[in-house]
A protein has these predicted regions:
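A short, N-terminal "cap"/entry segment at the start of jelly-roll beta-barrel domains
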Residues: 1-32, 40
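Short histidine-centered beta-strand/loop micro-motifs
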Residues: 19-20, 38-44, 85-86, 105
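Short, conserved beta-strand element in jelly-roll/cupin
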Residues: 33, 43-59
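Structural motif
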Residues: 49, 56-58, 65, 81, ...
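A cytosolic small-molecule/anion-sensing beta-strand core signal
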Residues: 53-54, 69-70, 88
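Short acidic-glycine-tyrosine-enriched beta hairpin
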Residues: 63-78
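Ligand-binding loop in jelly-roll beta-barrel domains
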Residues: 78-103
């Protein structure tokens, strides 16, 4: 059953860094990882941009490693092998964009 709940939220703001991730037509996913959650090494066929909102992620890619914290942005070209581990509960935004739609790759 479809329901619309009107008027329960009167204020909602989106961080400009998150808005900047939105393609002309598309979406941004919010992800929450519990402390200790590991996303093992993998790749994507599209460019990926992550913005850390809360917590800390140990982010690894072929040839590098870094602890990422709120405000950090990770730019991953298509095909980049990477993994992450939440060092504390982490919340981050993810945009997956075809290379032509990614302003960071143009």
């Amino acid at each position: 059953m479809t329901r619309i709940i009107a008027g329960t939220k009167t204020e909602f703001s989106i961080d400009p860094a998150i808005l900047a991730l939105l393609p002309e037509q598309g979406s941004v996913e919010l992800q929450r990882d519990a402390a200790g959650k590991v996303h093992h090494f993998h790749t994507h066929p599209v460019d990926e941009i992550l913005v850390i909102i809360k917590g800390a992620l140990k982010f690894e890619w072929d040839g590098g490693e870094r602890i990422c914290r709120p405000g950090d942005t990770i730019l991953l070209p298509a095909g980049t092998r990477h993994q992450s581990e939440a060092l504390a509960e982490a919340i981050y935004a993810i945009a997956m964009l075809p290379p032509a739609a990614n302003p960071a790759s143009n």
